[in-house]
């Protein structure tokens, strides 16, 4: 007889370690899993470091069978989301679980109960978000072909997660679509023709790459365009200055300036395109650690990246 499922709140450094470490065991042997850096996961969860928690709260849970951790989940309340959307929606995130419907139901139930405490009057639980709508969002559902390893900042999970969520009473609320396009000389030429046509028809617009020597001001322009362009999109929550600053510190050494572009009308930014090398192609070989040898694998592998992640 299998031991029963128990769910408990993460309340000690040992529990937190179990929470962080679970995916590395669950996905062992999965050639498409990209292990996130453990330091990044801890940073995301840390209310003292991640500025998202300045306007949000969370409770973390572990599911066990005996001494074995079989699942995890976070209940999250984001005051900024509820201010913008004028609702009482809470979230779940960081969900990982063995193919164990009983454990999954217990985790979702714990998150629902915690959400009512974190957000009195809560009437909806949505997820996964890890930890916000500006981070990894949703379950991976399908791809036109074999999905392969995820691109930087994209979600990844086993197909059975959809069944676990459905068995616990969840249903799909929204499809979020990511597109993959091959790039070759013909596509570059076509993009060049489109850009030239836009310039001819709109001579008041200027196109330029990012000025890394004026990074703080450039970052403020990203914030203005991003929050303005996305404000009517489903589920959007504007990034605070603190969140944008934190993201910039993480990305500054990763972005490739020739593929970060601004479009301006006079002195006003009206569009941007942020291109980043898909460093997941390197992270997949690092085992979730920078030390002792992860940093060397990163330095040796970063120049071999042949895919770009675009945000615009």
Predicted regions and their residues:
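Catalytic cores of nucleotide-enabled group-transfer and carboxylate-activating enzymes in metabolic
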Residues: 13-16, 21, 35-39, 43-47, ...
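Acyltransferase donor/substrate-recognition loop-hinge adjacent to the catalytic core
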Residues: 3-5, 155-235, 259
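Flexible glycine/acidic-rich beta-alpha junction loops that bind and position SAM and/or redox cofactors
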Residues: 131-140, 175, 181-182, 278-284
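A conserved beta-strand-loop-helix scaffold within acyl/acetyltransferase catalytic domains
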Residues: 23-65, 75-83, 217-311
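Acyl-donor binding region in acyl/amide transferases
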Residues: 83-169, 286-312
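Residue-level detector of conserved, well-ordered beta-strand and adjacent loop positions
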Residues: 8-11, 64, 93, 208-211, ...
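Generic start-of-chain signal for non-secretory N-termini
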Residues: 1-32
């Amino acid at each position: 007889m299998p031991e029963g499922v128990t769910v408990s709140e993460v309340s000690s450094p040992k529990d937190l370690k179990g929470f962080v470490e679970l995916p590395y065991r669950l996905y062992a042997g999965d050639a498409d899993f990209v292990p996130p850096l453990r330091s990044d996961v801890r940073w995301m969860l840390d209310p003292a470091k991640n500025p998202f928690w300045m306007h949000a709260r969370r409770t973390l849970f572990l599911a066990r069978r005996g001494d074995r951790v079989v699942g995890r989940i976070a209940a999250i309340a984001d005051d900024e989301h509820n201010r913008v959307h004028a609702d009482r929606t809470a979230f779940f995130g960081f969900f990982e679980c063995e193919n164990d419907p009983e454990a999954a139901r217990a985790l979702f139930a714990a998150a629902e109960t915690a959400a009512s405490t974190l957000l009195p009057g809560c009437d909806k639980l949505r997820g996964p978000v890890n930890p916000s709508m500006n981070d990894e969002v949703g379950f991976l559902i399908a791809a036109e072909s074999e999905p392969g390893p995820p691109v930087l900042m994209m979600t990844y999970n086993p197909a059975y997660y959809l069944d676990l969520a459905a068995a616990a009473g969840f249903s799909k609320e929204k499809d979020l679509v990511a597109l993959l396009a091959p790039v070759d000389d013909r596509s570059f030429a076509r993009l060049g023709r489109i850009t030239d046509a836009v310039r001819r028809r709109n001579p008041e617009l200027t196109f330029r790459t990012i000025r890394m020597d004026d990074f703080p001001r450039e970052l403020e322009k990203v914030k203005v365009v991003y929050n303005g362009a996305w404000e009517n999109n489903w589920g959007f929550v504007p990034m605070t200055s603190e969140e944008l600053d934190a993201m910039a510190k993480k990305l500054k050494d990763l972005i490739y300036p020739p593929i970060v572009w601004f479009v301006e009308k006079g002195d006003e930014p009206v569009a941007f395109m942020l291109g980043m090398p898909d460093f997941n192609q390197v992270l997949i070989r690092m085992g979730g650690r920078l030390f002792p040898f992860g940093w060397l694998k990163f330095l040796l592998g970063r120049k071999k990246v042949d895919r770009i992640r675009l945000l615009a």
